Curated annotation (Swiss-Prot):
The lineage of its organism: Bacteria, Bacillati, Bacillota, Clostridia, Eubacteriales. This is tRNA modification GTPase MnmE. Keywords: Cytoplasm, GTP-binding, Hydrolase, Magnesium, Metal-binding, Nucleotide-binding, Potassium, tRNA processing. GO terms for molecular function: GTP binding; GTPase activity; metal ion binding. Exhibits a very high intrinsic GTPase hydrolysis rate. Involved in the addition of a carboxymethylaminomethyl (cmnm) group at the wobble position (U34) of certain tRNAs, forming tRNA-cmnm(5)s(2)U34. Pfam families: MMR_HSR1, MnmE_helical, TrmE_N. (6S)-5-formyl-5,6,7,8-tetrahydrofolate binds at R22, E87, R126, K459. GO terms for cellular component: cytosol.
């Protein structure tokens, strides 16, 4: 029930400098005051202004000291939830935070549900639903680029875009209703003007969807598989990109027998990099199992880095491997360019890999790596919106709502002048309702429950 008093530990479990127990509700200030002994005698928490701090001791129900704490007080409506909020900053560690939480629960404060603080912020009008969803995007961001996009959503960028679309759809609906209700005064619907506005909204939705696809890459990241025959430098490339010794590197072919993977940030894109076993014909059972796993990883990868050895040239093994990845999104890396003898020519590369990005370099001397990272970024973002004027992060729920709105608009455009105004109005309202699901104006309770279900306790 909104307004009742809730509490939860808001910091991650484990040892640390401090831990924070957050409380929100109508009576949390009074309840914390009962078990708080300020250092300065005569200071009452209930008399303090918002955005103030108080140092003292937090006690249990018997007024025995639990911990030295710093209380942060935020008064409604200028708090995260829009209600009175108290944050108890205690010593870090599981036990101090748990004891502080138990102490306030003895005063009649209940344990918060996952996402309940943010849900209250939404219900109290502090955040709209798009901003509330951005909170979890900020928490889960894997790179600075992804976090910056989430912060823009939290600041209301998505809401501004949706509000603009809603305003335009309301204008079209007003034109429609005026022609229906006041035909003598207003006259027939100006189909040309209505079509123009609907087309404008549709174009804007298309841009939002494209921008959302690009943001999805920054949020979820991509899987990149490194492949090639044994001893071409796959593990060396993994180590070079990670800037650490993750994979064992030897001159013995077949050293890597299982998938080695790690995360890396390439120009703001979270990349799960997977070093695969060298693909070749072998009688070794363990190596053969590793090769089979490699082929599975390659088939599931968003991008494949295919490595060639300039010293050995392109042989039949290389050609067989390339046949398996020919239809994949790929980059060819010609390695060991530091060798004096080079057995791969530009003409041969152009003939075998037409239209494929070729990067030449030496992993051991770290040449070509910057070009490779740039090529990975371009390959991943190929065809995506590049303009910075439409930077939004769109989740699956919002994407589905936009697609629904777009479908209604397309049906309206197709039916314009062919059906009655009443029938036309059905799709206009359908588009408005779909947009309202993004802004939160038309959200059902079960959808709200689903949105906040994925939040952690204490947020």
């Amino acid at each position: 029930m909104i307004g009742d008093d809730i509490a939860a530990i808001s910091t991650a479990p484990g040892e640390g400098g401090i831990a924070i127990v957050r409380l929100s509700g109508n009576d949390v200030i009074e309840k914390v005051e009962r078990i708080f002994k300020p250092y300065r005698a005569g200071i009452k928490l209930s008399d303090k202004e918002g955005y103030s701090l108080s140092l003292g001791w937090l006690c249990d129900e018997k007024m025995e000291i639990i911990d030295e704490v710093l209380l942060g007080l935020m008064r409604a409506p200028r708090s995260y939830t829009g209600e009175d909020v108290v944050e108890i900053n205690c010593h870090g560690g599981t036990l101090p935070a748990r004891r502080c939480l138990e102490a306030v629960m003895w005063q009649g404060v209940r344990l918060a549900q996952p996402g309940e603080f943010t849900r209250r912020a939404f219900l109290n009008g502090r955040l709209d639903v798009s901003q509330a969803e951005a909170v979890i995007e900020v928490i889960r961001a894997k790179t600075e680029r992804g976090m910056n996009l989430a912060l823009k959503q939290l600041a209301g960028r998505n809401s501004q875009e949706i509000n603009l679309l809603e305003d335009q759809m309301i204008e079209v609906n007003a034109m429609l209703e005026a022609s229906l209700d006041f035909p003598d005064e207003v006259g027939d619907l100006d189909y040309s003007a209505a079509q123009g506005k609907l087309q404008e909204v549709k174009n804007r939705i298309d841009k939002l969807l494209l921008a959302g696809e690009r943001a999805e890459i920054y949020r979820e990241g991509i899987n990149v598989a490194i492949c090639g025959k044994p001893n071409v430098g796959k593990s060396s490339l993994l180590n070079a990109l990670l800037r650490k010794e993750k994979a064992i590197v030897t001159s013995i072919p077949g050293t890597t027998r299982d998938i080695i993977e790690d995360y890396i940030n390439i120009r703001g894109i979270p990349v799960k990099l997977k070093d695969t076993a060298g693909i070749r014909s072998t009688e070794d059972l363990v190596e053969r199992i590793g090769i089979e796993r490699s082929q599975e990883v390659i088939s599931e990868a968003d991008l494949v880095l295919f490595i060639l050895d300039v010293g050995t040239g392109i042989d039949q093994e290389d050609r067989k491997i390339y046949e398996k990845i020919e239809k994949k999104n790929k980059i060819v890396l010609v390695n060991k360019e530091d060798l004096e003898e080079k057995n791969i020519s530009e003409a041969e590369l152009e003939q075998l890999f037409p239209g494929v990005k070729i990067v030449r370099g030496s992993i051991i001397e770290e040449t070509g790596l910057e070009e490779l990272e740039e090529s990975i970024e371009k390959a991943v973002l190929s065809g995506q919106l590049q303009s910075d004027d439409m930077e939004v992060m769109i989740n699956l729920r919002q994407k589905n709502a936009l697609l629904t709105a777009k479908r209604h608009i397309e049906e309206s455009l197709a039916a314009m002048g062919k059906v009655s105004l009443d029938c036309l109005g059905v799709d206009i309202w359908g588009a408005l309702e779909a947009l309202g699901e993004i802004s939160g104006k038309n959200l059902k309770e079960e959808v709200i429950e689903r949105i906040f279900h994925d939040f952690c306790i204490g947020k």
